[in-house]
Curated annotation (Swiss-Prot):
The keyword Methyltransferase applies. It is an enzyme of class 2 (transferase). Belongs to the methyltransferase superfamily. RNA methyltransferase RsmG family. S-adenosyl-L-methionine binds at G75, F80, A127, E128, R146. It is found in: Cytoplasm. The lineage of its organism: Bacteria, Bacillati, Cyanobacteriota, Cyanophyceae, Synechococcales. The gene is rsmG. Its main location: cytoplasm. It holds the Pfam family GidB. InterPro entries: rRNA_ssu_MeTfrase_G, SAM-dependent_MTases_sf. It comes from Synechococcus sp. (strain RCC307). This is Ribosomal RNA small subunit methyltransferase G.
Amino acid sequence: MSSTAPWDQLTWQPSSDQLQQFNRLQELLREWNGKVNLTRLVEGEDYWISQIFDSLWPLQPWLSKGEPLKVIDVGTGGGFPGLAIAIALPQAQLTLVDSVGRKVQAVQAMADALGLTERVQLRCERAEKTGRDPHCRRQFQLAVARAVAAAPVVAEYLVPLLSADGTALLYRGQWSDEDQRQLQRAAAQLNSSTETIQVQELPAERGLRHVIPLRPQGVCPKQYPRAVGVPAKLPLA
């Protein structure tokens, strides 16, 4: 598909420089995918819709403002949504977290090649450690995670990272009433609450997507996130 095809469904359009960066990111993804198994979504609609568009559609309120932000992407994997956000929000400072060293090295190399070194920091560690680090805890206006774990687990990763006015965005595929109930119970224990669910039908019949925003209702209790591995083994309920 054309690299310009998805933009007409957003309230934001990339500049020519940003479009060049998205194209360059695709080239880098091809290169690094041959060395490290980053993602199968590299070509055509897989890249432009399932990677770029799907990374950015939940951020339309922030895309239209273009304000300085501190953003964290937990479980960035092959660099999404983090690198796409870094290109789309040139005033933002991003922290990308993943526990797989080879992926972190690849994403760092791609960020450097894109000229994003000054704005993108990589951390190779488990999300639970990030949430307990005073340099990260309560520091971010926006925290995102895509395809990382069950929603209550992701909430425990993200909410401790949020500043008082911050928002966590949980990227999901399908979403049920029971999913919502489970997340609301977890969110309450984290002193946070869910906001209006965002729904998007991806272009080219690529499926239905949901994003669930979480906002702090006060300070997250100090015991969260729990020790490494505990949130996934014993999700908040």
